[in-house]
Amino acid sequence: MRLSLCALAGALVLSTLTACDPPGQPKAEELPAAQVTDFKVLYTENCSGCHGDNGQKGPGRILNDAVYLAVIPRETLKNVLIYGRAGTAMPAWAISEGGPLTPQQIDALVNGIEAWKKPVTTPPGAALPSYAETTPGDPVNGKRLFVRGCYACHGQGALIGPVTDPSYLSLVSNQNIRTSIIVGRLDLGMPNYRVLNAGHPLNDQDISDLVAYMVSLRPAEAAMENANTK
């Protein structure tokens, strides 16, 4: 009888233990905000509103794009998160710059975004363009390239919108224009640099020329302010 009571007591203890949630790490959403390093949580709460739920189809720069991630240096991507983009809607995110994120959280975002990288193949005889301008552009050749490859969608009166409009050019930096030409918006139907030269890829100089042409149309009062914004 005594053995039976002991066995019953043991069974009750065991059933009580198995009915409870096992101890373990708290979920990311249960951690204090400064301790969250889960990429999905950080991205959803801080980035998806502008850059889309999966790095695409947001109003801001597409991040989940093979060409973009192939050309932007890791250090540049990290600095954009830390310091933001002057003159744009991209704020500084690092605590050191007045933002909410710790260095560990910045690194978690950089690592998560870079995990979206995919192999990029370049057309025969072509190389990936440089993220930043390496040589000055020629606006005369840039205008020729614009008329041939961009005007149908982005000229005056075009349905998609004129990117040569002075108001638009007052708001964007030279680097913003360059990145948009290189990367495009495949998620929204805008091609990237590979087909903007009458169906052929633009080379690095072509891209600089296009930027130079568009910058030449920028209002004088905005030219100095935006020219050196990275």
PLM feature spans:
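Gly/Gly-Pro-rich "capping" loops immediately C-terminal to redox-active cysteine motifs
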Residues: E29, V36, K40, G52-I82, ...
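Flexible coil segments in periplasmic/lumen-exposed cytochrome c-class electron-transfer proteins
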Residues: P23-E29, A33, T37, T44, ...
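Bacterial N-terminal signal peptides that target proteins for export
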Residues: M1-L8
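Residues that flank catalytic or metal-binding motifs in active/ligand-binding sites
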Residues: P59, A86, Q105, L159, ...
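Disulfide-stabilized extracellular ectodomain repeats and their linkers
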Residues: T44-C47, G60, G87, V147, ...
